[in-house]
């Protein structure tokens, strides 16, 4: 049986979220930054542990605020489909403090607008541009501790430029989404467990 998962990728301008997606799908990277101005949909099929998953990856342009309801979601063409995904990937640039603040704000808004009684939607925080480690503005341990211990989210650092931890990111994403119904196991713990197992490949 093929599972279908919708995933939203969000982040401030220039953090490299589209580069992450394209590196994952096409194994390519461009030094030229082309801002995302409209929602882009990618439909890859991924095999993990012998199971096929159809992904609907929604790459969104930077949004000023997360839509508080369905009416607001569909009133803005850039936000359509944002509230009905199975997981969120929130990307920031490890060399840009403002991009982390953006992720912090969007995450909080996602939690505040979540419909009461609905199941937990996994949120994974991604620190991109790991290849620019010397320009890091927040120590990795500080961010990791905040995200995993306080926010209870998964955390991965990657480099879209060098394809470092890109496949790992999406492998753990699939695992987290698949375990989202395990209500008695914390999301962050599920994610960390996934880091030690499972492999995926694009068809």
Curated annotation (Swiss-Prot):
Region entry Small GTPase-like, spans: 1-203
Main location per the UniProt record: membrane
Proregion positions: 201-203
Location of this chain's protein in the cell: Cell membrane
EC code(s) of this entry: 3.6.5.2
Gene Ontology biological process terms in this record: positive regulation of peptide hormone secretion; regulation of systemic arterial blood pressure by atrial natriuretic peptide
Top-level division of the source organism's lineage: Eukaryota
Membrane-topology annotation of the record: Lipid-anchor
SUPFAM superfamilies from the UniProt entry: P-loop containing nucleoside triphosphate hydrolases (SSF52540)
Location of Cysteine methyl ester modifications: 200
Covalent lipidation (S-geranylgeranyl cysteine), chain numbering: 200
Tissues of expression: Expressed at high levels in skeletal muscle and, at much lower levels, in heart, brain and pancreas.
Renumbered ranges of motif Effector region: 33-42
Subunit structure: Interacts with CADPS.
Physiological role: May facilitate the release of atrial natriuretic peptide by cardiomyocytes and hence play a role in the regulation of arterial pressure.
Similarity remark: Belongs to the small GTPase superfamily. Ras family.
Protein name: Ras-like protein family member 10B
Species this protein is from: Homo sapiens (Human)
Lineage of source species: Eukaryota, Metazoa, Chordata, Craniata, Vertebrata
